[in-house]
């Protein structure tokens, strides 16, 4: 029995504790909202209408709660509640005359009506809508985060060892193949040499007398990790060649004639599919191809087939340079023949030009004038491989296509030996002096350290040429003359023009070979094809440049990031690209690189990407709610505690409060809340004049005034930035903070991007500084401040400048100040809301839609994205719109108070009335006052004038709101999707229009032509092109010489 009761209790307790109360609460809210929504949609069509409804509800409800005490007339109660609900702060009755209950109601009204509270409450509505209408958004967002974190950790963890891992993987693929080659009994390995025979690399050296030395060593993973070189065979398509030793050194090596090392046993790789058969088939195909030597008198060139023949080739063909065995031809261009299969078989299309660098020329016994430092004149050229440790690169027939004419060889084609990376930096200007100074061309494998990796020159010339012609040749004919990058020529003294073929290093792609296709980065010299039938020069058409003009680094030393998607593996990120991505996104909150337009407009998103973006936005909103709740509650409580401690420690001010029948603790909390919420009401009858010689109260209240309104977006972004910097890397917490920093206006109305935030901070400093300077110039030595120290006078001026923003405290009698100071305060109250209003509107994601500018693009081509255009537009709209209300209110009050104005009372003048109206419309609360009363000038108005002031308060409270559409206040429903789609289309059209305008401007000014806005564009473009071509012909003379090979024309270029 007890067992059954215990089980029943546990079962019901477990069910009770597992109840999702949030689910039932959301269902209840949804049930109520579904009943009200059809009617509310008609009454409240947009956010501005809803905001009006909320403020009016607080005003009426507050008056109903305050009036029953009957300490004042209802019009005064309505005036108080309107001032508390709009943060205007004007009073017609002394606040201390109200009861404690009435003061508490005003306290709560001001707390519930601040912009922080209202816009922060929208975050709860958006959060509810996310969880209600998106199934499992929390779980799906968490899964996306774990996926991104795992991928990032795998990428970062594998980056330091990526180089050795790749090499070991490639080397293991050919284990067990070397012994098959050794069984052939013939010297079928390519002719090459190695400077270090102790490395685990298979090498073969062929000297002049035909002495063959062949080394085969067993591969070792540890050796691969240390040196970066594995067992190299021609089946791997990885070729290394050491330049010939000087003849004096080669004579000593002839004693090793006939030495041959047999192959050591190699363990067979245990695989279901041995790649041996595939490489054997490739080898059999290659054995049937021969090389043909291109010979000419003094100068011989690489034998390159036509583009049509290259397209027809079905596989990559290896190229192994053969050393020149004729000492008498050391100063000539020696063709490099490719030995495949046997040493006698030559291929007819894979001759390679091997260029000898200056370092080897200086160390060798052979003299070659063209390689003399800073010399250019020579009649014969020696091309040779660079000495140094050979590194391993991987090739494929699937590669990215790059035009060999796009990069100008302005300086030597050499590696960057500082970072151990292979880089090509395209230049945009021609500099003939650099050509003369750097007349030598280095091989890609110059003297580099063990940490540096170089590309093999033996194969890239042919393979790159094949890939480069698979582009559409008719695509960019106009680029051959318009773009400076269209000329890839390199002048070698008076010799032939040479070009550099490029390719990218990429990771394997999944294809029919099972992911065994690779490309390498090669830098080879290619000669332009010439047409010898009619003696005319024909330049190859340049394919479109596919990459931006940035320095590309391809090296095994760099940290490579591998992403897996759609069954393929790509080299998506290097260390530099990851840094560029980090600059684009503050955190790793997306698994893809977004295309973001102006004001955080995401363009061209798939459904999966939209779901992931919605998940990160949901988590960002959830985190932002926590931050704002702590911010709002904390700054409402902590300053009150601080002031309470201070006033109880200051007997003078404590006795002052007690003598006025004010509780010191209540004064502390009411004053701190009035400062932070920009209410402007005080329990003391003279506002803040009692504390004009106390620095603590003025400084603390000034800080609260700023961070409660104008400075709130600044401090909020600063808090988020500090939290982001101190957050744990790759955490869910940091991802959300990064999204808030990058795309704040997608989540919150009062959180701006970095540049508008700095702009707001600058405006805040300038406006307050201006008020302080005016005060110090005109009123610092006024008799009103007799008995006040100079330091406190400056502090009073600074405090009063802060009060002109929104709060309306008075630390001095404003009616006694200089007239110019009063006018400056009037202007500052009028524009007090503009910094926030402009920041809200110019950072609105749907700003164009809200402004209604989607009809037609600007025909005049004005850049609407410029901040000055937005600021000017908003200022014109805001100021012109506000003046109508102010003038109308002044007109009505002048009619209602006509008799008082006729009395010519200096304290009840038109300027004083205008000052009161602007203070009410700007929701500031400053007043000129009236003698004999301890309230605002509004206390002297009649009922009609008070109603006008109430209307000014309510209307002015809505000046800082966005226009009808703002994504931060929209719910993620069909309407928001429609606006997103409209914004995306507009962003694309805008980009295309700007791109066309920029293109027309560039063509119109091509060749330093006049700017005419695109008129007579075609004639001017043709004229400028002809002018440029004529300058080229006038600036240089060219001569062509036909070589013995009919496919080559040697072109000699010399400057006139």
From Swiss-Prot:
Q: Name one GO cellular component term.
A: chloride channel complex
Task: Provide residue ranges for segments that penetrate the membrane without crossing to the other side.
Answer: 74-90, 666-682, 794-810, 910-928
In this chain, the stretch annotated as Disordered covers 180-276, 290-350, 404-571
Q: Which GO terms describe its molecular function?
A: chloride channel activity; chloride transmembrane transporter activity; high-affinity potassium ion transmembrane transporter activity; potassium ion transmembrane transporter activity
Q: Which portions of the chain have biased composition (kind: Basic and acidic residues)?
A: 236-245
Ranges of Acidic residues compositional bias?
Answer: 428-449, 469-487
* Catalyses which reaction(s): K(+)(in) = K(+)(out); chloride(in) = chloride(out)
**Per the record, what ranges lie on the membrane's Cytoplasmic side?**
1-46, 123-622, 711-754, 842-874, 966-1056
Q: Where in the cell is it found?
A: Cell membrane
Query: Does the record bear Transmembrane in its keywords?
Result: yes
Please summarize the record's notes on activators and inhibitors of this protein.
TRK1-mediated chloride conductance is blocked by 4,4'-diisothiocyanatostilbene-2,2'-disulfonic acid.
In what ranges is there compositional bias, type Low complexity? 186-203, 412-423
The topology of this chain with respect to the membrane is: Multi-pass membrane protein
This entry's comment on induction and repression of expression is: Induced during biofilm formation. Expression diminishes when pH was altered, either to acidic or to basic conditions.
The text of the family note is: Belongs to the TrkH potassium transport family.
**Role according to the record:** Potassium transporter that mediates K(+) influx, as well as Cl(-) efflux as a secondary function. TRK1 is the major K(+) uptake transporter that regulates membrane potential and intracellular pH. The TRK1-mediated Cl(-) efflux should serve as a Cl(-) detoxification route and may play a role in sustaining C.albicans on mammalian epithelial surfaces, or in physiological saline solutions such as saliva.
Name of the protein described by the UniProt record: Potassium transporter TRK1
Q: What is the lineage of its organism?
A: Eukaryota, Fungi, Dikarya, Ascomycota, Saccharomycotina
Q: Which gene encodes it?
A: TRK1
